[in-house]
Amino acid sequence: MGRGEGAGVYYLDDEPTAMSRQIATAANQIESGVSREQLLDILPAGGARNAVDCALWDLEAQHAERSVWNLIGVEEGPVDTAMTVGLEADPTAMAEKAAAASEFRIIKVKLDGDRPVERIRAIREARPDARLIVDVNQGWDFGQLQRFAPTLRDLGVVFIEQPLPRGQDAELAGYTSPLPLCADESCLDSHELAWVEGRYQMINIKLDKCGGLTSALALAAGARRRGLGLMVGNMLCTSLGIAPALIIGLLADFADLDGPLLLTHDHPQGMRYEGGRVFPSQRRFWGAG
């Protein structure tokens, strides 16, 4: 039995019932022995395909008696992961949460247009040692990006993720940003890399967004060919969703794989988080072969 998990992506309308319906509609084809490559034509990119694709990888590893890491040709191991500080009304509260996450060397900060510089300044004072990533979640316009980016650079921010709304970021073409810009919502899969190039310097790969590990590997390879940096992220998921994403983390420049830490209950004996790193589970519940 192959195992996989799909959390879905809200802006793809990936509600649980919709994902279940997609899988049920394709059940006969899947059960007949569909390949991972054939699955790309059967299910659209999103959480449903992610779940099935990762289950097929797990099943393939069992049949081959080789781990997924071995099948892909990467060495299994831990990666540094960011810890996310959510947007709050009080910048001081955000700084306190960043300080409490002292074992994490990378802090990802959610921002909008309300006092972003004040928030980052407070967090920087609390965590002078941390590498700071800013995620605007499509919350600025081009003028705000131009206004805020230089000061964020001076405060030691490493890059800005998705500053402008998807479909409203054409102005980035030709813009020389003082900080690298990372496309999240603006890069769903490999088909959008040509548009991303020249506007962004990095992409955030999420398996729920691109539709599984197979698509994520293709997206990572395509991005590298274009000279783009790589980040891997996750939707809110258990360790079963993080296990395949960790493979992309081994290929990426940055990882944001803290999803299970935000849950009350995780997959039993899930991924191990220690010293700001995420380690493969010793229980080997996915991809072990």
Please report, for each region that a protein language model flagged, where it lies by residue.
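Active-site-adjacent beta->alpha loops and helix N-cap segments on the catalytic face
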Residues: 90-91, 112-128, 140-145, 164-176, ...
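N-terminal capping/lid subdomain adjacent to the active-site entrance of alpha/beta enzymes
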Residues: 1-132, 139-146, 150-154, 269-289
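Conserved, mostly hydrophobic/aromatic
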Residues: 52, 65, 107, 135, ...
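Flexible C-terminal active-site loop/helix
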Residues: 233-289
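Catalytic alpha/beta core domains of metabolic enzymes, predominantly
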Residues: 167-258
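Flexible, glycine/charged-enriched surface loops at secondary-structure junctions
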Residues: 36, 68-71, 159-163, 234-235
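Catalytic beta/alpha-barrel core
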Residues: 84-86, 105-115, 131-139, 155-168, ...
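Short phosphate-binding/catalytic loops that engage adenosine nucleotides
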Residues: 128, 157, 228
